[in-house]
Amino acid sequence: MSTNLLRLILLFITLSITSSLSTPSPADSPPYLWPLPAEFSFGNETLSVDPTVTLIVAGNGGGSLIIRAAFDRYMGIIFKHASGRGSLLSRIRFLKMVEYDITSLKIVVHSDSEELQLGVDESYTLMVSKKNEQSIVGAATIEANTVYGALRGLETFSQLCAFDYITKSVQIYKAPWYIQDKPRFGYRGLLIDTSRHYLPIDVIKQIIESMSFAKLNVLHWHIVDEQSFPLETPTYPNLWKGAYSRWERYTVEDASEIVRFAKMRGINVMAEVDVPGHAESWGTGYPDLWPSLSCREPLDVTKNFTFDVISGILADMRKIFPFELFHLGGDEVNTDCWKNTTHVKEWLQGRNFTTKDAYKYFVLRAQQIAISKNWTPVNWEETFSSFGKDLDPRTVIQNWLVSDICQKAVAKGFRCIFSNQGYWYLDHLDVPWEEVYNTEPLNGIEDPSLQKLVIGGEVCMWGETADTSVVLQTIWPRAAAAAERMWSTREAVSKGNITLTALPRLHYFRCLLNNRGVPAAPVDNFYARRPPLGPGSCYAQ
């Protein structure tokens, strides 16, 4: 067990003795950081932070607009109270030369590249100390190889800062701090589903913003499904006739803005177009995509037009989504009506195909379309289970149904994303945070070379029973449990009693989300997203 983790456990034991008497006070409790950094040390000092703290940048990437925008964003979070940054009181304090321990934040970024792809370096070092004989001015310093590592460091810095209601100032407890941090997995995702229920642009942005607080880095956008097709596709403009209404749609500009907004927070957007099943809505605008009026999905495998439409959709989407991964679905394909539709049945017989052969033909042809547009295909696990040896070797398999699929996929040389429905499907409201937290993506995979093929994991917010009114409180705080599992070291999340090492911090993180305007539900809910049963502190629900 690491020294840092042991120190935390001892501190949490102390906290648990007094937690029934009062709510946590940052000054009297261990560091409430989420997710837990890889390596860190801290002391016992309390430092004050100047509300006019200045940004100092250095390195090839220090001048990035991403850094400047993030600094301004986080200063608004840290100094949001009336006596905070930009307020009259802060200006008076400045004029009176009130002395603060932390007066500047230095951000050093070594690379000037802002390319955001799978595996981008998100490591950072954060140092916070007061002025002393060697330092005339107190400072905090974040050093990172990329702007995206600096973003993660800014989030950690913001979590160290707490507003003191007595002194009406922002303070950092347990200083000095030295943190060296990096993620365990390069892919840490959250799926949203805008087909089952339309989510307005501002709600999607709020989800993305909240993801950045937990250091998640991939938004898996399940844009379309059998119920609705809300996205504008200029090459085939009738497709979005499959939207629920004229007002529940996304323009090309909307989608581009979501991608831009996400990139500013170090988050990739992976789009999904699920084929050949889950596609009934396509035929609202183009009925020829249906095998027949009584067989509306899977899509018609016999027609070149079907694949022309897929190619057109992907060509349009390639202009919007720069991320190297593109999800082609391929799950839950019921082919019964293919064999009961005359022209499809004749097509199958002419090629000596079974319906399973036709399913494989469809998936592989769709993969080649995606690859031709410089995308790496991602498919749900049924494609691997049904015809894994025929999939393109570049395919990333996403697990959802069978617990050992990642074990089997990596053994065959495929990369895998873990998102087992029993634990990481957020629409399963009866799964408590403990089960989410304790679920390990690498279980059963002992070979380090195969472990590397599990690129990460994803919690899935399927939309059948979640719309704008409840989506954020269904996501949070349970998504945070998976976020720490994917970011922090395996040792840190697997050792000790999580009611001591994780629960107090998760309570605090839930309240942090609430304070930042995210309606995260109580941690100790028997059913997710249920409101509190009675009065009480945010830190004890």
UniProtKB/Swiss-Prot annotation:
The active site is at residue 332. It comes from the Eukaryota. It catalyses: Hydrolysis of terminal non-reducing N-acetyl-D-hexosamine residues in N-acetyl-beta-D-hexosaminides. This is Beta-hexosaminidase 1. Has a broad substrate specificity. Can use synthetic substrates such as pyridylaminated chitotriose, pyridylaminated chitobiose, p-nitrophenyl-beta-N-acetylglucosaminide, p-nitrophenyl-2-acetamido-2-deoxy-beta-D-glucopyranoside (pNP-GlcNAc), p-nitrophenyl-2-acetamido-2-deoxy-beta-D-galactopyranoside (pNP-GalNAc), 4-methylumbelliferyl-2-acetamido-2-deoxy-beta-D-glucopyranoside (MU-GlcNAc), and 4-methylumbelliferyl-6-sulfo-2-acetamido-2-deoxy-beta-D-glucopyranoside (MU-GlcNAc-6SO(4)) as substrates. GO terms for molecular function: beta-N-acetylhexosaminidase activity; hexosaminidase activity. The lineage of its organism: Eukaryota, Viridiplantae, Streptophyta, Embryophyta, Tracheophyta. Belongs to the glycosyl hydrolase 20 family. Residues 1-20 form the signal peptide. Disruption phenotype: Reduced amounts of paucimannosidic N-glycans-containing glycoproteins in roots and, to a lower extent, in leaves. The keyword DNA damage does not apply. The gene is HEXO1.
